[in-house]
Amino acid sequence: MTSSPVSVLIHGASGRMGQALLRLAVQDPALQVVAAVIRRAPAQRVVDGVPYFAAAELNGAPAFDVAVDFSLPQGFDPVLALCVARGAALVSGTTGLDEAQRQALADAAARIPLIWASNFSLGVAVLNELVERAAAALPGWDCDIVESHHVHKQDAPSGTALTLGE
């Protein structure tokens, strides 16, 4: 039995994670990238068989099963609203969300399949568990998180550091 590929919209396709996702997704026969969304109007509408859309054109994107969002906080609300309106799943790694956006995320999780994480790496998931265990074992202790990043890092402190600090 052959199933059809999962149709994917990649939101934030011009960023580091978005570009990495695009490279991998177009090679996976189980996936079909139906749209790549970037902030500004693209120079080319189709690149390597993938249709590109400006963020302002998001509502004109074709139907998709799941949106994968690694954008910026200011681009997050429209993709969340589109997923809810279309009943599509959302996977998001966008960090720096404000309280209203976090609440909208929680509300949407009751209506659509949704996963959000500040960092999707296995190493950080294990680190997060270890930090929780250490905090429980050492009540009354203080700790600091010190981090360094490449020069292109857009959010500091990082979403990962903020999650660990929670």
Label each residue range with its predicted role:
Residues 24-47:
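NAD(P)-binding Rossmann-fold cofactor-contacting core
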